[in-house]
């Protein structure tokens, strides 16, 4: 019911007032997106485009956005540069914390997930990065839009940030990903699923 109330409220607020992350906003078409980027968006597949927004964060090297003809821009994912780190994940956790602070200031309290699989071999603190690389540890933070914070979220319904490695055998460097889902993401992904 809460989600329906949020959808109802946002439906009557003009989308153009929402200035989203990296200077991007919900519903942008490809022309508008190109104007907000340093280069033309590069098509990948299935509504996904690789972009370099003019307003980018220095930690992030790459950005992938989901844009459809029907919904415009509906999802953003940023990927950081590789961060050299110890087996304990000290450096990547520090960078993660640096990102959490401004996000918490803007969007409020988050739900942090630091979950280790019960059946993993990598239980010691010195195995922190091995557990991340193996997929046995989830280290993320999540925000979700509610009736109380709908204006603060500026057209977003969810924000998530986490730590991963590029491959299971890499445990001395990691990257941070961040994802923003706009209100129209539900329709965007549903439309994408309809063609499968």
Feature locations, PLM:
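Non-cytosolic coordination micro-motifs
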Residues: 20-47, 82-196
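Mid-chain, structured segments of secreted extracytoplasmic proteins
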Residues: 56-102
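Intrinsically disordered, low-complexity segments enriched in polar/charged residues with Gly/Pro
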Residues: 10, 51-54, 128-130
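Generic marker of residues within folded, mature protein domains
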Residues: 9-11, 66, 133
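Sec-dependent N-terminal signal peptides
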Residues: 4-17
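Long, hydrophobic N-terminal alpha-helical segment
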Residues: 30-43, 47-71
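Compositionally biased, low-complexity repeat tracts
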Residues: 16-19, 23, 58, 68, ...
